[in-house]
């Protein structure tokens, strides 16, 4: 079943601000005066929703691992001391995507940025590169998964959805699918659930569905 939500940029910002006001996280990733230039690993122990306590290991890549990022965006991410978390399935650098997210033909980017044990999904629209939009913010350990029993890593992945790949909403959010003329962001908890973020008339339409 696909669930539809429409969220304004203001509402998202308020939600993330509230989340960031929580007590500081105890995480292996520590603050540094300099921007990390090499791959880092965040490790620790956490209790899963089923009550089992496991060890996790999350690979974090520096922004320099993504040379195709425009300099203006890379500079902002480095200023925030961002590292890009990689899923436990990753074989090549991931979780940085490029497409027409604002409108047809626009040149936009989305990036997962991990800082001090928490990750934010930032979107850089061409019309406001200097003011990235934060679509989701959560602890790095919120979504974990593994290919091998006991070897847990991040299960948060983002990818580009072309207009034809955007799922239908039973609520009729997109009665005329010919109006879907630009890309969307697939924001997934791998093998569990996913959300599709589509920007329309200044609002992010969010379609959520289990995998």
Question: Where would I find each of the regions flagged by the language model?
Answer:
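Acidic, small-residue rich beta-repeat scaffolds with periodic aromatic anchors
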Residues: 5, 11-16, 20-64, 139-211
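Extracellular C-terminal loop/segment signatures of secreted glycoproteins
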Residues: 123-139
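Short, non-transmembrane alpha-helical segments in secretory-pathway proteins
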Residues: 61-90
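Primarily extracytoplasmic ectodomains and periplasmic/lumenal surface modules that are beta-strand-rich
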Residues: 104-107, 116-120, 129-130
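Acidic, divalent-cation-chelating loop motifs in proteins
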Residues: 96-104, 126
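Acidic/hydrophobic-patterned starts of short beta strands in beta-sheet-rich repeat architectures
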Residues: 103-113, 180-186
């Amino acid at each position: 079943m696909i669930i539809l939500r429409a969220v304004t940029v203001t509402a998202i910002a308020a939600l993330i601000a509230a989340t960031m006001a929580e007590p500081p996280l105890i995480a292996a990733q520590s603050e540094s005066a300099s921007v990390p230039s090499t791959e880092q690993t965040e490790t620790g122990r956490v209790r899963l929703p089923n009550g089992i306590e496991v060890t996790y290991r999350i690979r974090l890549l520096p922004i320099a691992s993504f040379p195709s990022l425009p300099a203006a965006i890379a500079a902002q991410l480095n200023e925030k001391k961002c590292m890009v978390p990689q899923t436990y399935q990753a074989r090549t650098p991931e979780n940085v995507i490029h497409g027409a997210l604002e409108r047809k033909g626009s040149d936009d980017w989305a990036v997962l940025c991990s800082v001090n044990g928490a990750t934010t999904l930032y979107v850089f629209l061409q019309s406001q590169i200097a003011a990235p939009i934060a679509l989701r913010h959560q602890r790095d350990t919120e979504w974990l998964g593994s290919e091998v029993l006991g070897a847990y890593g991040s299960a948060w992945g983002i990818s580009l959805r072309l207009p034809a790949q955007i799922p239908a909403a039973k609520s009729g959010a997109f009665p005329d699918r010919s109006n879907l003329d630009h890309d969307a962001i697939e924001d997934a908890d791998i093998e569990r659930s996913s959300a599709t973020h589509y920007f329309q008339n200044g609002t992010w339409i969010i379609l959520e569905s289990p995998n």
